[in-house]
């Protein structure tokens, strides 16, 4: 049977619907957030857009049908995500971050935990956010360090039938919630024993953001993703029931890998969307601007070559994303190599593609009046976040290559 990249009628309808939503709703985000100089206020200003996204069914798409969601495949979610990110990166990132906060529950929660916490989000999908509290103030790349004195320094100790959590996190996307006090649910990556390595002590404990001791202490004002909130959060003697742990101590490494594998593949879709936006701007400029010459600049060979390079990067990123997402769907995420490759490759392609679009347009692209300057600010984030390409993602691939019996053709052949 031939390999077929055609979309089904249902997928075409999903893609068209997401494109229409992006053009009709998300295209207004930039002008709205421009009115707010403070980082957190820009985020709060996107709440109506997120509510419309929830009404359109995108929050339900994060969850399996068995727990009230629509059960959308990762491939289908990627199709929609690409379209959304052509128009705006901010509100789709808030959606993706709610997914990241809930992925530990989806993958490792008990039946009771899944029904309870997914149900809570879906009771008010436009109002309730989830977050993953992963990154320590000192960094997150060494979260799995075998040295107990290094890595995660947020600790949970068991006192009777409660976990008592103390520590500090930052870059906790969505962590402040819409009220600035805490997301509805925060999946906290912590250790249960300071004397044991992560393989024995790393855990994920679900903390309602309204729990006493959860404190939003500040916001990191990022260069790009201007309305994606990145708060610092302190956990000061936060008490939650012992039953709020997902799995058992020591499962934290697997849980984090499960969650970040999902986002790794989908970041490829976000990067593809941003590259498309940059290409559209450069293409329109090339067709219509003569730069004081006699013909539109697209008639010049070098301009055509640059457009070709950008378009090739878009196509390569899209199809690697599709394959990675398909492989996650059919293997229940047991095969994650392509997802990690997608995150690294697409994010670095995106930076180069946007830069080439800026080079094509010239110095005018470097002003704040040009949308390309904003797209570059957004693109620069992709290689650095969600497991930085150097600190985490390439290390994941290196670890795979070093493993006994590694088969370099396994991911290519869907094994």
Predicted regions and their residues:
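Glycine-rich phosphate/cofactor-binding loops in nucleotide/flavin-utilizing enzymes
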Residues: 3-4, 80, 361-415
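Glycine-rich phosphate/pyrophosphate-binding beta-alpha loops
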Residues: 140, 170-177, 225, 262-267, ...
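Amphipathic, small/basic residue-rich leader segments at the start of a protein or domain
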Residues: 1-93, 116, 120, 402-415
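A short core secondary-structure module
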Residues: 161-162, 166-214
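C-terminal helix-coil-helix/basic helical segment that borders enzyme active sites and/or dimer interfaces
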Residues: 30-40, 283-295, 311-345, 358-366
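N-terminal glycine-rich flavin-associated loop
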Residues: 92-112, 140-141
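Glycine-rich beta->alpha junctions and the first turn(s) of the following alpha-helix
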Residues: 3-16, 215-315, 411-415
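A short, Trp-centered hydrophobic/proline-enriched beta-strand micro-motif
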Residues: 126-139
């Amino acid at each position: 049977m031939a390999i077929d990249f055609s979309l089904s009628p249902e997928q075409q309808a999903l893609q068209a619907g997401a494109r229409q939503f992006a053009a009709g709703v998300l295209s207004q985000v930039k002008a709205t957030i421009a009115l707010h100089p403070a980082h957190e206020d820009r985020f709060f200003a996107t709440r109506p857009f997120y509510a419309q996204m929830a009404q359109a069914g995108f929050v339900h798409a994060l969850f399996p049908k068995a727990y009230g969601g629509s059960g959308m495949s990762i491939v289908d979610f990627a199709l929609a995500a690409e379209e959304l990110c052509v128009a705006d990166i901010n509100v789709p990132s808030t959606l993706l971050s709610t997914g990241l906060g809930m992925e530990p529950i989806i993958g490792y929660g008990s039946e009771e935990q899944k029904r309870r916490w997914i149900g809570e989000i879906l009771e008010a999908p436009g109002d309730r956010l989830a977050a993953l509290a992963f990154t320590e103030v000192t960094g997150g790349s060494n979260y799995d360090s075998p040295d107990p004195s290094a890595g995660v320094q947020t600790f949970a100790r068991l006192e009777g039938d409660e976990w008592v959590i103390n520590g500090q996190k930052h870059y906790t996307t969505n962590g402040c919630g819409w009220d600035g006090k805490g997301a509805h649910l925060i999946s906290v990556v912590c250790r249960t024993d300071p004397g044991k390595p992560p393989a024995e002590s790393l855990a994920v404990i679900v903390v309602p953001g309204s729990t006493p001791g959860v404190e939003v202490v500040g916001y990191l004002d990022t260069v790009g993703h201007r309305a994606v909130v990145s708060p610092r959060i302190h956990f000061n003697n936060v008490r939650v029931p012992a039953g709020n742990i997902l799995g058992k101590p020591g499962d934290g490494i697997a849980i984090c890998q499960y969650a970040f594998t999902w986002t790794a593949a989908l970041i490829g879709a976000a990067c593809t969307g941003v590259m498309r936006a940059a290409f559209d701007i450069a293409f329109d400029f090339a067709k219509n601007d003569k730069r004081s010459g006699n013909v539109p600049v697209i008639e010049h060979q070098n301009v055509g070559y640059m457009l070709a390079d950008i378009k090739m990067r878009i196509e390569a990123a899209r199809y690697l994303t599709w394959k990675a997402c398909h492989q996650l769907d059919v293997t229940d995420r047991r095969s994650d190599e392509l997802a990690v490759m997608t995150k690294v490759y697409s994010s670095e392609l995106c930076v180069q593609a946007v830069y080439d679009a800026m080079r094509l347009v010239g110095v005018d692209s470097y002003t704040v009046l040009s949308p390309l300057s904003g797209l570059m600010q957004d693109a620069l984030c992709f290689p650095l976040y969600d497991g930085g390409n150097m600190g985490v993602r390439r290390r994941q691939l290196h670890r795979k290559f070093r493993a006994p019996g590694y088969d370099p053709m396994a991911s290519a052949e869907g094994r």
